[in-house]
UniProtKB/Swiss-Prot annotation:
Expression sites (tissue/organ): Liver.
Keywords: Endoplasmic reticulum, Heme, Iron, Lipid metabolism, Membrane, Metal-binding, Microsome, Monooxygenase, Oxidoreductase, Signal
Positions contributing to heme binding: C435
EC number: 1.14.14.1
Gene designation: Cyp2c39
Species whose genome carries this gene: Mus musculus
Membrane topology, as annotated: Peripheral membrane protein
MF terms in GO: arachidonate 11,12-epoxygenase activity; arachidonate 14,15-epoxygenase activity; heme binding; iron ion binding; oxidoreductase activity, acting on paired donors, with incorporation or reduction of molecular oxygen, reduced flavin or flavoprotein as one donor, and incorporation of one atom of oxygen
Pathway(s) served: Lipid metabolism; arachidonate metabolism
Upper lineage: Eukaryota, Metazoa, Chordata, Craniata, Vertebrata
Function: A cytochrome P450 monooxygenase that primarily catalyzes the epoxidation of 11,12 and 14,15 double bonds of (5Z,8Z,11Z,14Z)-eicosatetraenoic acid (arachidonate) forming 11,12- and 14,15-epoxyeicosatrienoic acids (11,12- and 14,15-EET) regioisomers. Mechanistically, uses molecular oxygen inserting one oxygen atom into a substrate, and reducing the second into a water molecule, with two electrons provided by NADPH via cytochrome P450 reductase (CPR; NADPH--hemoprotein reductase).
Descriptive protein name: Cytochrome P450 2C39
The keyword Signal belongs to this UniProt entry's keyword annotation: yes
Length: 490
């Protein structure tokens, strides 16, 4: 048999196998566009704007439909009612983490974000308990964030009102809060280890959100057999893991079980106390992976939201003026903002909520998977099926938020100017997998933004109407375009 004949037979076999799997897999799944062999619906999706593609499909197939990403079926939920019904009303059945091949290669089933089953339940329970022990929701954590907010102000003063890219400085602040929780201590913004950690984390988020990584996740064979930026991610992860394991080793050598200092100490104590079954879940590798998850989730999401916020505040100076007027009235110029102030600052609270709604940071959520065969709206979704929930369709629902494509804090204010909650506000996801650090993120956004606006004016290098809001990258998360700002003392 010559090579050409062999290749033709191999390709034909793959196509037939793909067609057979798709026909068998369709079963009672929701409707959707007809997939091509092997590549599925990949060519019908705009990988630079997946959210819009999902919206277009929903118009044709309804709020629950099926796409084939490669040869694997993925059920998509579009609109508040479908998303709520799955994540909240059927939270347990939709509580597994869906497949992201590149992330699976990085985490190997470990950590708090991408693990499943008993391992995920154990590590999530431990993490939430430990964060509470370390002061989450209490004055202790608030003190740390306030301290970091003042350090942030000092760094911003050093720019002396000159044009600067705020990316690095705005990343340092939330990263240092996580450092204080994980390692007990914060880092100086010039510390070499800190700078390297920041660089690796930021680079990985950009690459993981790129169109190329979406291609790799749809066709996992590319990860092992093709060159590309994904190899840089793996190299960075290896560096971060090595750094974290060294920090863990230092903690092991100085551990006092009667006086835990930070997250690592609590974990090491838990490891010593764990029974035979739990010991498998509380390995040092799982600790390193969990810390990496906390850094990635706790640093990049908050810092990116802050970057978007400054960009929006420059584009809408009337909003900035109202926020600063409220800051001056409630807080003044001579004391640090605190969380109690938020109850008396409805416009500022509404502005921060509107930033999160408008930017739609994680457009399609992190994929879920069903834990068992489930009948959902007369469709049968088999156990293990990946489920994508469109947060864009919830946060930009015109029935809940009139003119959703406009930035308007009024979306979260009632007729009397009081803050108005919305069940559609899901930037942290919802249900069993809601972000474990939601409380910390809300605190950081309020304290960092109010402290910045208390001390500085924001000046754009271009006219406000010319400020570009189109995301630089719009994959796993939406990253804002690069910009410069003049941060001028008030």
């Amino acid at each position: 048999m010559d090579l050409v004949t062999f290749l033709v037979l191999t390709l034909s076999s793959l196509i037939l196998l793909s067609l057979w799997r798709q026909s068998c897999g369709r079963g009672s799944l929701p409707p959707g566009p007809t997939p091509f062999p092997i590549i599925g619906n990949f060519l019908q999706i705009d990988i630079k704007n997946v959210s819009q593609s999902l919206t277009n499909f929903s118009k044709a197939y309804g709020p629950v439909f099926t796409l084939y990403l490669g040869s694997r079926p993925t059920v998509v939920l579009h609109g508040y009612e479908a998303v709520k019904e799955a994540l909240i009303d059927h939270g347990e059945e939709f509580s597994d983490r869906g497949s992201i091949p590149m992330v699976e290669k990085i985490n190997n089933g470990l950590g708090i974000v991408f693990s499943n089953g008993n391992r995920w339940k154990e590590i999530r329970r431990f993490t939430l308990t430990t964060l509470r022990n370390l002061g989450m929701g209490k004055r202790n954590i608030e003190d740390r964030v306030q301290e970091e907010a003042q350090c942030l102000v000092e760094e911003l003063r050093k720019t002396k009102g000159s044009p600067c890219d705020p990316t690095f400085i705005l990343s340092c602040a939330p990263c240092n809060v996580i450092c204080s929780i994980i390692f007990q201590d914060r880092f100086d913004y010039k510390d070499k280890d800190f700078l390297m950690l920041m660089e690796k984390l930021n680079e990985n988020v950009k690459i993981l959100s790129s169109p190329w990584l979406q291609v790799c996740n749809n066709f996992p064979l590319l990860i092992d057999y093709c060159p590309g930026s994904h190899h840089k991610v793996l190299k960075n992860v290896k560096y971060i893991r090595s750094y974290l394991l060294e920090k863990i080793k230092e903690h092991q050598e100085s551990l006092d079980v009667t006086n835990p200092r930070d997250f690592i100490d609590y974990y090491l104590i838990k490891q010593k106390q764990a029974n035979h079954i739990q010991q498998a879940e509380f390995s040092l590798e799982n600790l390193a992976c969990t810390i990496n998850n906390l850094f990635a989730a706790g640093t990049e999401t908050t810092s990116t939201t802050l970057r978007y916020a400054l960009l929006l505040l420059m584009k809408y100076p009337d909003v900035t003026a109202k926020v600063q007027e409220e800051i001056d009235h409630v807080i003044g110029r001579h004391r640090s903002p605190c969380m109690q102030d938020r109850n008396h600052m409805p416009y500022t609270d509404a502005m921060i909520h509107e930033v999160q709604r408008f930017i739609n940071l994680v457009p399609n959520n992190i994929p879920r998977a069903v834990t068992c065969d489930i009948k959902f709206r007369n469709y049968l979704i088999p156990k293990g099926t990946t489920v994508v929930t469109s947060l864009t369709s919830v946060l930009h629902d015109s029935k809940e938020f009139p003119n959703p494509e406009l930035f308007d804090p009024g979306h979260f204010l009632d007729a009397n100017g009081n803050f108005k909650k919305s069940d559609h506000f899901m930037p942290f996801s919802a249900g069993k997998r809601v972000c474990a650090g939601e409380g910390l993120a809300r605190m950081e956004l309020f304290l960092f933004l109010t402290t910045i606006l208390q001390n500085f004016k924001l000046k754009s290098l271009v006219h406000p109407k010319d400020i570009d809001m189109i995301p630089f990258v719009n994959g796993l998360i939406a990253l804002p375009p690069h910009y410069q700002v003049c941060i001028i003392p008030r």
